[in-house]
């Protein structure tokens, strides 16, 4: 009972960029073909685009090597970012006080499916 696997997934955890900023990039590539998604990411002027590109590249490699899927027929079926743990830091302020700084992290997941 060998099931036909038509999708592959890749996840990057603890990426030092907020999930809110990553979602803006992921919304641009969701539903697109892999070639089109790489072209969009290459010209997206956002810092998170390089992190998303790495995850997409990994998902495509997983599809090709682990499941023997054809790269030309792959589509970004799912792309989402969840919040990771927040690193809490403090910025010194006037009169001996301090203000909190939240350095947010995210978990980026990309799923590619054969069309």
From Swiss-Prot:
Gene Ontology annotations of biological process type: translation
SUPFAM superfamilies to which the protein is assigned, alphabetical: Ribosomal protein L22 (SSF54843)
Pfam families found in the cross-reference section: Ribosomal_L22
Classification via CDD domains: Ribosomal_L22 (cd00336)
Family: Belongs to the universal ribosomal protein uL22 family.
HAMAP family assigned to the protein according to its UniProt record, in alphabetical order: Ribosomal_uL22_B
Protein name: Large ribosomal subunit protein uL22
